[in-house]
From Swiss-Prot:
<dbReference type="GO" id="GO:0070628">
    <property type="term" value="F:proteasome binding"/>
</dbReference>
<feature type="compositionally biased region" description="Polar residues">
    <location>
        <begin position="48"/>
        <end position="60"/>
    </location>
</feature>
<dbReference type="InterPro" id="IPR013868">
    <property type="entry name" value="Cut8/Sts1_fam"/>
</dbReference>
<dbReference type="GO" id="GO:0015031">
    <property type="term" value="P:protein transport"/>
</dbReference>
<comment type="similarity">
    <text>Belongs to the cut8/STS1 family.</text>
</comment>
<comment type="subunit">
    <text>Binds the proteasome.</text>
</comment>
<keyword id="KW-0813">Transport</keyword>
<dbReference type="InterPro" id="IPR038422">
    <property type="entry name" value="Cut8/Sts1_sf"/>
</dbReference>
<dbReference type="GO" id="GO:0031144">
    <property type="term" value="P:proteasome localization"/>
</dbReference>
<protein>
    <recommendedName>
        <fullName>Tethering factor for nuclear proteasome sts1</fullName>
    </recommendedName>
</protein>
<dbReference type="GO" id="GO:0005634">
    <property type="term" value="C:nucleus"/>
</dbReference>
<dbReference type="Pfam" id="PF08559">
    <property type="entry name" value="Cut8"/>
</dbReference>
<feature type="compositionally biased region" description="Basic residues">
    <location>
        <begin position="28"/>
        <end position="37"/>
    </location>
</feature>
<keyword id="KW-0539">Nucleus</keyword>
<feature type="region of interest" description="Disordered">
    <location>
        <begin position="1"/>
        <end position="75"/>
    </location>
</feature>
<keyword id="KW-0963">Cytoplasm</keyword>
<comment type="function">
    <text>Involved in ubiquitin-mediated protein degradation. Regulatory factor in the ubiquitin/proteasome pathway that controls the turnover of proteasome substrates. Targets proteasomes to the nucleus and facilitates the degradation of nuclear proteins.</text>
</comment>
Amino acid sequence: MNVLLPTQASFFSSPHRNPIHTPVSPHTNHRMVGRKRKADDDGLDDNMSISPTNSPSLATRQIPRPSKKVRANEISGRPLSLPRLLETLDAQSLRSVLQTICERHPEIGSEIVTSAPRPSVASTLGVLSKYQNELQGAFPYGGSPGSDYAYDRVKQQLTNLIDALVDFTPHYLPPNEQQTAISLSFLDSATKIVHDLPNWDSQSHRHHKDNAYDEISRAWALVISEASKRGGGFQLHSGGWDQTLARHNEQSGGKMQMAVNALGSNLGWMGGNSGVGSGDPDSIRNQLLSGRYGTNQSVPVGAPW
């Protein structure tokens, strides 16, 4: 008698069979699930350990890169800043720069003129003295100092001195300068500079000094006239300026007679019968008032007219 026994699945069945119908032990399934979770946890840890590049925490915790230290040690050439550059310029260089800027921008020149302090008599005389020294230093050694050769050697320095004198003088005249004492103080020193100008042998070279006397004489006359209008005639006499001007005229050979005449007329307008030497008819002051000063000077025999 044939009996059919039910077929049971073997645990050693071929792997090629359908795995879905392969029974799995509950313990084995638990171990696999635990292993899977562990693997997933490891991946999760890896993902958490890597911050995204756009994370805000990354930007705030960035460590300075070594390249910055290298950049700090780099050096390259660059121009000086303005304050340091000005420290290196001497007075002549600074004047040259300012003059160039003012020529390009006239409004800056006007601002400098109005903002700069007024030059004092001492500072101006210092500039003129520099030109005088340059003139004296340009004369050749030996020979006649009034010769044509000497004139050719110092002509430029002579012109520089006279031009400076002509430019500075109007600054100390009214109405630009209202204080008579300052005007007279400058004119006194400026006249001494004119006295010291070279005396040339050639008549054609003497116009430099003659013109300088004419200019300075006109300046004296203007200051005297304006001072008398403001009641400054007393200052002219009490300060001894009448005698100072008389000596200047005598040293110039009468080439400042215009200033002397202006002083005489203005002191006469004030009616100055008081003062030192007023009782002496031959005093310089009385000669100025009467217009006789210089008229009774004798001319030496053989002297040129």
